[in-house]
Amino acid sequence: HGSRLRRVGLHYWWGGVMIELRPITQAEAFDFIRKHHRHHSVPVGALWWHAVHDSEGVLRGVAIVGRPVARRLDDGFTVEVTRLCTDGAPNACSMLYGAARRVALDKGYRRGVTYTLPEEGGASLRASGWDYLGDTPGKSWSVKSRPRDDKHPLGLKHRWGFGEWRKEPSND
């Protein structure tokens, strides 16, 4: 059936269109983000990046994985998907998030985190083995000692993760 998703190795078929994971240079990944990301520019720093291409070789999406932006999470065992950007290709987000999770665990990281806006449903994250961890308030990076122009959404974000996360102590 041409309209159903099928995984064959590292390839996905959807409606007759195949997407597959491929390596990509940092310059290519950052260029794609500059052209296609809805609300962010390129991240500062990265540990690795990967991409999905279609059967014609057209770049359809990229993921950038780096150290956690939140200092309290930067323990040497945690990674963050700091950017994920596609052109809307079916299942590209799931493939990119799944690859980020697998690579991180294979490299010895114990957990990963990423953040989405409330209007982004999270189906791709759930499909690729990530769990909803809760909400976190957005905030500005601008402080009196170092004023900055905020160019990203400052509202509530959904936190997603995989791996070993300590449970918060209950009040029971």
Q: What positions do the PLM features span?
A:
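A residue-level signal for beta-strand positions that form part of recognition/binding surfaces
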Residues: M18, T78, K157
